[in-house]
Regions:
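C-terminal functional extensions of proteins
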Residues: 249-322
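Short internal beta-strands
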Residues: 30-34, 234-242, 278-283
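Extreme N-terminal starter segment of soluble prokaryotic enzymes
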Residues: 1-4
Length: 322
């Protein structure tokens, strides 16, 4: 059975995984998922990237938003707003059940990897979904001055302030400039059970078309993971999240630029060169293929836009070298 390990985070990774399980047996697929976005809110353990992967693979994701469950209701949020509670991070009524269950199982002493496996099994998934780490790891964003140079960016938010990823991405709608990113807790983190074995045993290690800074970055910040991936460099295939120099979703292109990297597939190539042997780029960036190769990677040009599961499956065939 073909064994594939996928470093994953966000909607792009979820869509790639949806295509991958159509071209290889899902039992041979391990998704190693970013936990830097995780948070505790209303006393609940929330793992947005893990849940997006789970819901997408279960064909239960809301197709319009790209997160949460299809046909969701919002009665709990409406009731919470009456009390003046925090409703900027929207949690649907059925989605709440996932967070309630996860929080209860963690409180009972189960590790996040085991709980994630339980949730995936409950959705009928055959692939393995594992967190990058079970220890607290939080992506923290330092804000830069806005375009007008003003120090105060918004209510309670100022240049130089460090905020959580969800505050940046959801509450502020990533509409602010960034001067730094760090992964709090990374130095004390360890790869979750099964992560290193999945990387070592995979025929192909795939870096999904996720944000290089805030989706792949936290995974690679866990001690041991970057070295394990680099040891497989010839078998590591990364998919660029940029098309024509732009992110299809989210702030990947802006973050690259704001943090001093080229906001193109060349910038992605330079970030990934130490641990990836091949970069798959979109046809819109074909003129940069030689620059990618100059950065030390093989370059494959194809259609990387996953408009539907069939397009995602076709991309995965290319990623697997078929």
């Amino acid at each position: 059975m073909t064994q594939v390990a996928v470093l994953a985070g966000g909607v792009g990774a979820a869509r790639l995984l949806r295509g991958l399980v159509d071209v290889v047996p899902p039992e041979g697929v391990t998704a190693i998922v970013n936990t830097g976005d995780d948070m505790v809110l209303h006393g609940l353990a929330i793992c947005p990237d893990i849940d997006t992967v789970t819901y997408t693979l279960a064909d239960a994701i809301d197709p319009e938003r790209g997160w949460g469950l299809r046909d969701e209701s919002w009665h709990a949020m409406e009731a919470l707003s009456r009390y003046g509670g925090a409703t900027w991070f929207r949690l649907g009524d059925r989605d709440l059940a996932t967070h309630l269950y996860r929080t209860q199982r963690l409180a009972e002493g189960q590790g996040l990897a085991a709980v994630t496996a339980e949730i995936a099994a409950a959705w009928g998934l055959a692939l393995r979904i594992v967190p990058a780490t079970e220890q607290p790891l939080r992506t923290m964003i330092t804000l830069a001055e806005n375009e007008g140079g003003a120090a105060v960016i918004g209510v309670g938010v100022a240049a130089g302030q460090e905020i959580s990823f969800q505050d940046y991405f959801v509450r502020l709608q990533h509409a602010v400039a960034v001067s730094g990113v760090r992964f709090a807790g990374a130095e004390a983190a360890q790869p979750a059970p099964g992560v290193l074995a999945a990387i070592a045993g995979a025929e192909v290690v795939v870096v999904a078309p996720s944000n290089p800074i805030v989706s792949i970055g936290p995974v690679m910040a866990v001690p041991g993971i970057r070295d394990a991936v680099a040891a497989r460099r010839d078998d590591v295939v990364a998919v660029s999240p940029l098309v024509g120099g732009k992110a299809l979703k989210g702030p990947a292109d802006r973050l690259l630029r704001e943090l001093g990297h080229a906001d193109s597939v060349v910038g992605v190539a330079r970030l990934y060169a130490p641990f990836a042997g091949t970069l798959v780029i979109d046809e819109a960036d074909a003129e940069l293929a030689e620059d990618v190769r100059a950065a030390g990677l093989r370059c494959v040009v194809t259609d990387t836009i996953m408009r539907d599961p069939a397009a995602a499956a076709a991309l995965c065939e290319v990623v697997l070298g078929r």
